[in-house]
Amino acid sequence: MDRIRRAIVGGHPLLYVQSWEESRVERLAQHLAKTFYGTPVPLGIWSVVDGLVVDGVPAPDTRDPVKALEAILHAQGRGFYVLKDFPTGAGRPETTRRLRDLYRGLKDRGRHVLLVSPRLLLPEEAKKEIFVVEYELPDEGEILRILEGHMKKRGGQALDDTASKRMALALRGLTADEIGHVVAKVFAQRTALDEEAFQEILAEKEQMSKKEGVLEFVPPRFSIEDIGGYDTLKGWLKKRQALFSKEALDAGIPIPKGLLLMGISGCGKSLAVKTISTLWNLPLFRLDMNAVFGTDNPESTFLRALRSVEAVSPAVLWIDEIEMGVGGYKEGGDASMSRIFSGFLTWMQEKSALVFVAATANRIHLLPAEIIRKGRFDQVFFVDLPNEEERKQIFQIHLKRNRCDPARFDLVFLSKATKGWNGAEIEQAVVSAAVDSYAEKRAVTEEDLHRVIAATVPLSVTMEEQIKAIKSWAHDRALNASKN
């Protein structure tokens, strides 16, 4: 609202308001028409269905965009005009010409036109005449007013300050209409605010992410206890657990930007990312770069995906195998990849939304230096093959998951027998033993595990040279995720 008001004060007659919220922009225009010039001035609303309607009175023969612009140009006195989904794209030379004429005709006359659309489609010829404003989604104050209005309407008891502010934080990223729908659902069958209410808000944000097509909502299934080892990483995450809270925001504590997990395949990088959303109680969205590059305009799709995840913030954005997608740029390579890479770096550096980026990488030698330099991510972690103690923990986790009592197994022996194994290989050994024993209608024994272990050649043997190279590369470039 402030940017629109400042643009009008600055004398801009043509404003392009990029927003999904036509009703909210229209309410703002109503407020401006009543108050901006001290006395009320006319308010016109145009759509291709109704044409131009000024203060409730239809202007004849104005459904055609050019004729609507002519009517605004020849109107008398000051006024505000909201044009919904006005066709400003390429292929409309007569509309473009009339817009440029309108700019000169309305300048310094107190008449202002607000072109409203969720997509930014500006003709090249008119870019200098049109002032672009990305209308921000409701902030905390506006969300609290919507909440208060709903509670009064239904005659319910007002929420206390703590509950209201937590609710406002959870509702960030939704439009005013979406907030109204969610609040109505949440309080339809309850009088108090409970954890289930916040799960409903999470479900609404999941629904929003599906509309973009390249963001996948990842439900919170794993906890930090499901990871064996990674003590340094776990400590880092726990220390930042409360930084997305209302209290931390009010205290001015810097919000974490993100982390990069790189290292050997099969060591649990993806699992570690999935536990962040559970630990921090934030929704997790995975950006599917294959889907991005499968569209007609990968650059536009990628930038829309970033805006979409900002819209559902606070959230965690997971970029898997970043070296093959965003970080796959090479100098002199594909121009679209270059623009995506540049756009991502700029977004990481300047983003103000509450989005934590969790990226993983296997082929770390492919990562451009710009990705791993300080300032992009808060920390770069190297994930190595698990040590003996960590392998014991991993065996415990997967034995329990397969309904086996770890106390019945010699975990020390199993850990020593699987030296050089990664977490995925240990998991598969336990699963294979469970399948074999089930086929024979009996419980899993340690001998089952011994047999599977003896028949397995781990990745550390088949790819010994590559793993040595990965370790050497990461030695001075990243912090080990484990203490040992």
Which residues are covered by each model-predicted region?
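Conserved C-terminal "switch" segment of AAA+ ATPases
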Residues: E136-D177, R190-A192, V316, F356, ...
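Glycine-rich P-loop/Walker A and Walker A-like loops and their local beta1-loop-alpha1 context
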Residues: M1-T35, G89-P93, S270
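A generic structural signal for well-ordered alpha-helical segments
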Residues: A29, A33, L106, L171, ...
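C-terminal engagement/docking regions of AAA+ P-loop ATPases
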Residues: M1-G10, E26, Q207-T275, R307, ...
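Walker A/P-loop NTP-binding motif of AAA+ ATPase domains
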Residues: L15, P40-L114, P118-L122, K127-F131, ...
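Interdomain "pre-motor" coupling segment immediately N-terminal to P-loop NTPase/helicase cores
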Residues: K165-F217
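Conserved phosphate/pyrophosphate-binding and hydrolysis machinery centered on Walker-type P-loop NTPases
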Residues: G11, Q18-S23, G89-P93, Q157-D161, ...
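Amphipathic alpha-helical coiled-coil
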Residues: G11-Y16, R24-L28, F36-D50, D108-H112, ...
